[in-house]
Swiss-Prot record:
Organism: Homo sapiens
Modified residues (Phosphoserine): 784, 788
The protein, known as: Cadherin-10
Residue ranges crossing the lipid bilayer per the database entry: 614-634
Any one GO BP annotation for this protein: calcium-dependent cell-cell adhesion via plasma membrane cell adhesion molecules
C-alpha cells in the first residue's frame, strides 16, 4: 500500500465517528425480529401447558477492510432475549474464522476481529451462534447462522494482464484505425462507489496514437504514417480508478506498435543503362548477368517480376526472376555467333506482382531499363556439317574402299585448315581409317557382318593452327549382309534306328541355321548327297526335313553305324550350301520302338544287367582295392626299438642350448644312439688339412648291453679313445673356407700362439659382461694361484 493510499484510509477513519454511530453501522437487517410466541397445548388431565418460542436478538454485521488500529476491531454484539444480564448464559461462536479471525466474549456476546481483513481475499464470512446455560450446559436458543460482510475501500490499483503489449497496424492507415485494445482490472468492489471504475489515458505516443477512455482501444491519430520513415512506436497507456478523479489509483502498460508494410512504393532501377558481356561460345542456358530493381517495401509487396519487352535480342536472350534475391537473371536463349552479330540491346521491365488498388494513385508500380550485351569473340572449334553421320556398306567390299566423307569448317572469321582423325578407342581393331585432309572414311581390313553388324566410330576434327580446338562427331557404320555363309545343322543330332524298323519310318527331324540375314528371310533346302539305299530325306518346306528309312530291318551286329551325308542349301544369291553328316546308330528296340541297347554298348553289357547294377559292381571293386592297400601298408610298418627305457633316461631327448652356430645344412648332428650301437658309426673321413703319416684301421668295440648305465658306458668309451693311438691330436690347426670378422679375443689354442699361458692377460674377459664372469674367474684364479 502506498503512502497516498494510507493517508486516504486514515482520513476516512478519522471522519467515520462523526458521520455514523455504532447503532447506524451495525443496524438490524430488514428481517423481522424473532418474537416470543406462546401456544396452548391441552394435557390429558385437562390442564393447558404453555410453550414459548424464544428468539435471538442481533444485528446484521458489516466490517471495514484493511483496519490498521492497534486494538481488535469491533464487529458487533450477539444477544438473546433470554439473557437477564446475570451472566448465566454463555455465547459460543463457530463457522468461518471462529476462534482465530473472529472471537466472541462469552458473557456479553461482543464479537471482535483479531487481524486486518482483505475483502479481495474474501468478501463475507458465514458464522453460527449459540447460547447455552452455564449451569446446565443446555442451549437456551437454537443454533442460528449469520453473515459478516466486508466493506470495500479503494486499496487496489488497476493492473494490466501484460506488462508489454505488441501490436501492429498497416502503414498509411486513416485516422481512427483500431490498433489494439488493452484492458485493466481492479480487484476492488465494483458495486461500491468508484473504486473499480477504470479510465484509460495515453501518457506516451502522441500525437501518433490515441486511446478511448472507457474501452482502452488504441487508435491511430495521424493520417498516412509511412513505414519507410518510421516503423516502430512505443505507447504508454495509464489505467486509473475512481473514474479518473484525483486520489484514484493507477497502473500503466507499454504497447509496442509496428507499422506493417503495404505496397506503396514502386520498383526502381538504379541505372538507366546496364552493360553486359558474353563469350560467343557460351552454351544455351548460360547466365550472363543480372539486373535488379530496388523496392522500399518488404515481403510480398517488394516482389518483382522481370520481363524483356523490347529490343533486337528478344530471340537470343531470356530473363528469369530469381525469387530469393529478387534479381532478373539474363540467360542465353540461342547459340551466339560473334561473326554474325556483336551487340544486342534489350529493354527490361520490372513490375510488382502484388499491387494494392488503394494506392494506384502512387503508381505506376513498374520501371524499365536498357541492357546492352556485347558478344566477345573466341577461337571456336571446327563445326561439322552434321550432328552425326550414318554410312552403309556391304561386307564384301575390298580393303581401301571409301565408305563416306565427313565435312567440317572453322567458323572463325580467320578460318584455319582442318585435320581429321579417328578416335582409336572406338576402333580398337583398326578396321577403318580416315583421310586427314578431306575426311574420307575408308576400310583398312575386311568386313564381316557376322562378327559385328554396327561400328560406332568417333571422328575428331582439329584446327591445324590451334590443335587444342577440336570437335568430335559420331559416325555410325552399318554393315550390309552378303550371302557368304552356308547353312548348317542347327544342333548336333544323336540319331538311332531300330533293328526292327520298317520302310518309311521317321527316325529324325532336322533343321538348319545360317549366319546370314537375307531381306526376304531364311529359306533352306534339304537333299541327299547321293542316293542311299537305307535312308532318304523328305523336305518339309519349312526349313526342316525328315529322315526316313527305306528298307525293312537292320542288323547292328553287321553294321552298327550309318553315316548319312545331307546337303543343305539356301535361296539367296549367290547360293551357298554345305553337307552335314548325320550319324545313325543301329539299336535294339522293344515292340513300342523304345531303344534298349545300341552298337558296342550292347556287347559290353550282359543281358539283363542294367547300368545302375554295373555302377554298383564297380564301386564294390574299388572299395575292396582300397581295403587291400591299407592292410598291406599296415603290415609293412615295423615296430621300432624304444631307446628310452625309463623316465630318468635322457638319451635321445632334445636339449636346447642358447648357442649360435650353423644350421642343419652346415652341421652334422651326433646320434647318441651310436654309443649303444658302435656298428652304426659312420666311417671316419680324413681331414683335408692334415696329411696322416700312418693309416690305422679303426677299432671295433663290442656292443654294450641294454641295461648298462649311460655314465659308466661313456666313461669306458672315453678311456678307450684316450688310449687309442689312432685318435687325432687335440690341438690341430683347421682351416675353413669362409669369411668373417676377427675376434677381439686372441686365440686360446697353444698352436701358433706367440705367448705362453703365463704371459697371457685375461683381464679383458671381465669386460665382456656377466655371462663371461665364470670364465674370467677361472682364468683370473689360475694366475693368482700361480703367483701365490
Amino acid at each position: 500500500m502506498t503512502i497516498h493510499q494510507f493517508l486516504l484510509l486514515f482520513l476516512f477513519w478519522v471522519c467515520l465517528p462523526h458521520f455514523c454511530s455504532p447503532e447506524i453501522m451495525f443496524r438490524r437487517t430488514p428481517v423481522p425480529q424473532q418474537r416470543i410466541l406462546s401456544s396452548r397445548v391441552p394435557r390429558s388431565d385437562g390442564k393447558i401447558l404453555h410453550r414459548q418460542k424464544r428468539g435471538w436478538m442481533w444485528n446484521q454485521f458489516f466490517l471495514l477492510e484493511e483496519y490498521t488500529g492497534s486494538d481488535y476491531q469491533y464487529v458487533g454484539k450477539l444477544h438473546s432475549d433470554q439473557d437477564k444480564g446475570d451472566g448465566s448464559l454463555k455465547y459460543i461462536l463457530s463457522g468461518d474464522g471462529a476462534g482465530t479471525l473472529f472471537i466472541i466474549d462469552e458473557k456479553t456476546g461482543d464479537i471482535h476481529a483479531t487481524r486486518r481483513i482483505d475483502r479481495e481475499e474474501k468478501a463475507f464470512y458465514t458464522l453460527r451462534a449459540q447460547a447455552i446455560n452455564r449451569r446446565t450446559l443446555r442451549p437456551v436458543e437454537p443454533e442460528s447462522e449469520f453473515v459478516i460482510k466486508i466493506h470495500d475501500i479503494n486499496d487496489n490499483e488497476p493492473t494490466f494482464p501484460e506488462e508489454i503489449y505488441t501490436a501492429s497496424v498497416p502503414e498509411m492507415s486513416v485516422v481512427g484505425t483500431s490498433v489494439v485494445q488493452v484492458t485493466a482490472t481492479d480487484a476492488d468492489d465494483p458495486s461500491y462507489g468508484n473504486s473499480a471504475r477504470v479510465i484509460y489515458s495515453i501518457l506516451q505516443g502522441q500525437p501518433y496514437f490515441s486511446v478511448e477512455p472507457e474501452t482502452g482501444i488504441i487508435r491511430t491519430a495521424l493520417p498516412n504514417m509511412n513505414r519507410e520513415n518510421r516503423e516502430q512506436y512505443q505507447v504508454v497507456i495509464q489505467a486509473k480508478d475512481m473514474g479518473g478523479q484525483m486520489g484514484g489509483l493507477s497502473g500503466t502498460t507499454t504497447v509496442n506498435i509496428t507499422l506493417t508494410d503495404v505496397n506503396d512504393n514502386p520498383p526502381r532501377f538504379p541505372q538507366n543503362t546496364i552493360h553486359l558481356r558474353v563469350l560467343e561460345s557460351s552454351p544455351v542456358g548460360t547466365a550472363i548477368g543480372s539486373v535488379k530493381a530496388t523496392d522500399a517495401d518488404t515481403g510480398k509487396n517488394a516482389e518483382v517480376e522481370y520481363r524483356i519487352i523490347d529490343g533486337d535480342g528478344t530471340d537470343m536472350f531470356d530473363i528469369v526472376t530469381e525469387k530469393d534475391t529478387q534479381e532478373g537473371i539474363i540467360t542465353v536463349k540461342k547459340p551466339l555467333d560473334y561473326e554474325s552479330r556483336r551487340l544486342y540491346t534489350l529493354k527490361v521491365e520490372a513490375e510488382n506482382t502484388h499491387v494494392d488498388p488503394r494506392f494506384y494513385y502512387l503508381g505506376p508500380f513498374k520501371d524499365t531499363t536498357i541492357v546492352k550485351i556485347s558478344i566477345e569473340d573466341v577461337d571456336e572449334p571446327p563445326v561439322f556439317s552434321r550432328s552425326s553421320y550414318l554410312f552403309e556398306v556391304h561386307e564384301d567390299i575390298e580393303v581401301g574402299t571409301i565408305i563416306g566423307t565427313v565435312m567440317a569448317r572453322d567458323p572463325d572469321s580467320i578460318s584455319s585448315p582442318i585435320r581429321f582423325s579417328l578416335d582409336r578407342h572406338t576402333d580398337l581393331d583398326r578396321i577403318f581409317n580416315i583421310h586427314s585432309g578431306n575426311g574420307s572414311l575408308y576400310t583398312s581390313k575386311p568386313l564381316d557382318r557376322e562378327l559385328s553388324q554396327w561400328h560406332n566410330l568417333t571422328v575428331i576434327a582439329a584446327e591445324i593452327n590451334n590443335p587444342k580446338e577440336t570437335t568430335r562427331v559420331a559416325v555410325f557404320v552399318r554393315i550390309l549382309d552378303v550371302n557368304d555363309n552356308a547353312p548348317q545343322f542347327a544342333v548336333f543330332y544323336d540319331t538311332f534306328v531300330c533293328e526292327n524298323a520298317r520302310p518309311g519310318q521317321l527316325i529324325q527331324t532336322i533343321s538348319a541355321v545360317d549366319k546370314d540375314d537375307p531381306l526376304g528371310g531364311q529359306k533352306f533346302f534339304f537333299s541327299l548327297a547321293a542316293v542311299n539305299p537305307n535312308f532318304t530325306v523328305q523336305d518339309n518346306e519349312d526349313n526342316t526335313a525328315r529322315i526316313l528309312t527305306r528298307k525293312n530291318g537292320f542288323n547292328r551286329h553287321e553294321i552298327s553305324t550309318y553315316l548319312l551325308p545331307v546337303v543343305i542349301s539356301d535361296n539367296d544369291y549367290p547360293i551357298q550350301s554345305s553337307t552335314g553328316t548325320l550319324t545313325i546308330r543301329v539299336c535294339a528296340c522293344d515292340s513300342q520302338g523304345n531303344m534298349q541297347s545300341c552298337s558296342a554298348e550292347a556287347l559290353l553289357l550282359p543281358a539283363g544287367l542294367s547300368t545302375g547294377a554295373l555302377i554298383a559292381i564297380l564301386l564294390c571293386i574299388i572299395i575292396l582295392l582300397v581295403i587291400v592297400v591299407l592292410f598291406a601298408a599296415l603290415k609293412r610298418q615295423r615296430k621300432k626299438e624304444p631307446l628310452i627305457l625309463s623316465k630318468e633316461d635322457i638319451r635321445d631327448n632334445i636339449v636346447s642350448y642358447n648357442d649360435e652356430g650353423g644350421g642343419e645344412e652346415d652341421t652334422q648332428a651326433f646320434d647318441i644312439g651310436t654309443l649303444r650301437n658302435p656298428a652304426a658309426i659312420e666311417e671316419k673321413k680324413l681331414r683335408r688339412d692334415i696329411i696322416p703319416e700312418t693309416l690305422f684301421i679303426p677299432r671295433r668295440t663290442p656292443t654294450a648291453p641294454d641295461n648298462t648305465d649311460v655314465r659308466d658306458f661313456i666313461n669306458e668309451r672315453l678311456k678307450e679313445h684316450d688310449l687309442d693311438p689312432t685318435a687325432p691330436p687335440y690341438d690341430s690347426l683347421a682351416t675353413y673356407a669362409y669369411e668373417g670378422n676377427d675376434s677381439i679375443a686372441e686365440s686360446l689354442s697353444s698352436l701358433e700362439s706367440g705367448t705362453t699361458e703365463g704371459d697371457q692377460n685375461y683381464d679383458y674377459l671381465r669386460e665382456w659382461g656377466p655371462r663371461f664372469n665364470k670364465l674370467a674367474e677361472m682364468y683370473g684364479g689360475g694366475e693368482s694361484d700361480k703367483d701365490s
